[in-house]
Design a protein with these regions (language model features):
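Juxtamembrane intracellular "pre-TM" segments in multi-pass secondary transporters
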Residues: 35-45, 225-257
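Helix-breaking motifs and short loop linkers at transmembrane-helix boundaries and internal kinks
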Residues: 80, 112, 133-139, 335-336
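Conserved MFS/SLC helix-loop-helix module at the cytosolic interface between two early adjacent transmembrane helices
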Residues: 99-135
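Helix-to-loop junctions at the C-terminal end of transmembrane segments
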Residues: 101-112, 301-314, 397
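Paired small-residue
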Residues: 127, 138-147, 339-347
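Helix-loop-helix hairpin linking two adjacent transmembrane segments in secondary transporters
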Residues: 139, 168, 177-224
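Cytoplasmic helix-loop-helix junction between adjacent transmembrane helices
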Residues: 143-182
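C-terminal transmembrane helical hairpin of 12-TM major facilitator-type secondary transporters
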Residues: 316-359
Length: 432
């Protein structure tokens, strides 16, 4: 089940040694792919260890990434802070992670992807164990920001590591296992802490969740095979920056970067403050309100159908259908009735995953010679949207309530629809 954090086509995909035209810079080592050992094949013990190791890397990292989202109402009550301030515990992580993804991807070309994955997962979850000791909001936000910095190595390099080490014929299966780990990890990071609130405070709930994330990291370290096909490359930051600059001058890519920023920001904003609505307006206990994150399961259907729709009717049509579902879902989510509101949330969830599945794949297709940089920039904008809009939406919710929050998010979605339409028209003109 892909979640907003973990579509396989949105991750920088620099894998095995590539030529200069693919990276925008000459390789530091002329070793050819033919001189490297064959990629791991399904049925080999090392293949299964690799797939399981990346499964646990996803479980650990995406658990840690969103571990405070379901705890935000509890943080507001315990610390006497506003929802916008509580949202900083999510925005700090995703914002710093967004800024660190591209440097981490480039650095991994020199230091090795496996080492970076191990360090990132272990260090981030160890820091997570210290978060319950934070004396106040300031230190908690600092700790969450540090977690975001450390976590960046996993989404920036995990899929590239798989593409590097696994035989191409068996790669989709391994990728699917990793994506499943991301999805389940993200759900655990939301459901487990909220469920524990019925029996304990936020500190205990967070400590238990981070203890589990650390256990996932340790398992990953123990079973991760040694890299066999890694070839270090010289760092060419200027060349990378020139490539990224060219991508922003392409209106189709720039539009898709904006689509990722807006729709991810809207999606995270809705779920950041949905718990407050369920608890304060409808009287649900925190443990029951946390079950709303199960609506993420709509992402399974949406991502698959979005891909099929893009293949059958075109990416432009598919992305606009997803955006339309968001436009329909938000007014329904504003209704003051629980059983009417939840289908609206489900519709927006479905629409978001459709948009994300199509946009992330479209970015790679538009930049075949610099796919890694384009996918990395999409991820950067995607997580920045989560951070910036997730925080700003907290001020709207605190000042004007749920209905105004839905209007604000609807306005953002309409801007996203405009960008998506511009991308679709531009793509049609180029095709013609």
């Amino acid at each position: 089940m892909p979640t907003p954090d973990e579509n396989p086509r949105t991750t920088p995909d620099k894998a095995t040694p590539t030529n200069a035209s693919e990276t925008g810079a000459p390789a530091a080592d002329p070793v050819s792919t033919a001189e490297l050992p064959e990629g791991l094949r399904h049925g080999q013990p090392a293949y299964h260890r690799a797939a399981l190791a990346l499964l646990f890397a996803g479980l650990a990292s995406f658990n840690a990434m969103y571990c405070t989202q379901a705890l935000m109402p509890a943080l507001t009550a315990a610390m006497r802070i506003t929802p916008a301030q509580a949202a900083l515990t999510v925005s700090a992580t995703t914002g710093i992670l967004a800024l660190a993804i591209l440097p981490a991807s480039v650095l991994s070309e020199r230091t090795g992807r496996g080492r970076l994955i191990v360090f990132s997962a272990l260090a981030a979850t160890v820091v997570g164990l210290l978060l319950p000791l934070a004396p106040g909001l300031g230190w908690l936000v600092v700790g969450r920001g540090l977690q975001g910095l450390l976590l960046a190595g996993v989404p920036a390099t995990a899929m590239a590591w798989l593409a590097q080490e696994i035989h191409p014929r068996d790669l989709p299966r391994a990728m699917g296992i990793y994506v499943a780990g991301n999805s389940v990890g993200g759900l655990i990071g939301r459901l487990l802490p909220s469920g524990l609130l019925q029996f304990s405070g936020w500190r205990t709930a967070l400590a238990v969740d981070m203890g589990l994330a650390l256990a996932f990291s340790v398992v990953m370290v123990v079973i991760l095979p040694r890299e066999r096909r890694f070839v270090p490359k010289a760092l060419h930051f200027r060349s990378e920056l020139r490539t990224m600059g060219r991508q922003w001058r392409d209106p189709r890519l720039a539009g898709l970067f904006g689509v990722g920023f807006i729709f991810m920001g809207v999606f995270v904003s809705l779920y950041n403050f949905l718990g407050y609505r369920l608890i304060d307006r409808f009287g649900l206990p925190p443990s029951l309100a946390g079950l709303v994150f199960l609506l993420y399961l709509f992402g399974t259907v949406a991502s698959a159908r979005g891909g099929r729709m893009a293949a059958e009717r075109g990416r432009g049509t598919a992305i606009l259908v997803g955006a339309a579902a968001c436009v329909v879902g938000l007014p329904i989510a504003a209704v003051n009735n629980l059983w009417v509101m939840l289908p609206g949330v489900a519709a927006l969830t479905y629409g978001f995953f459709t948009v994300h599945a199509v946009a992330s794949g479209w970015v790679g297709a538009l930049a075949p010679k610099s796919r890694g940089e384009a996918s990395g920039m999409y991820l950067t904008c995607y997580y920045l949207g989560s951070s910036v809009l997730g925080y700003l939406s907290g001020h709207v919710f605190h000042a004007a309530g749920w209905a105004m929050l839905m209007m604000w998010l609807l306005a953002l979605v309409l801007v996203g629809c405009l960008l998506a339409g511009m991308v679709a028209r531009s793509a049609r003109r180029v095709a013609a």
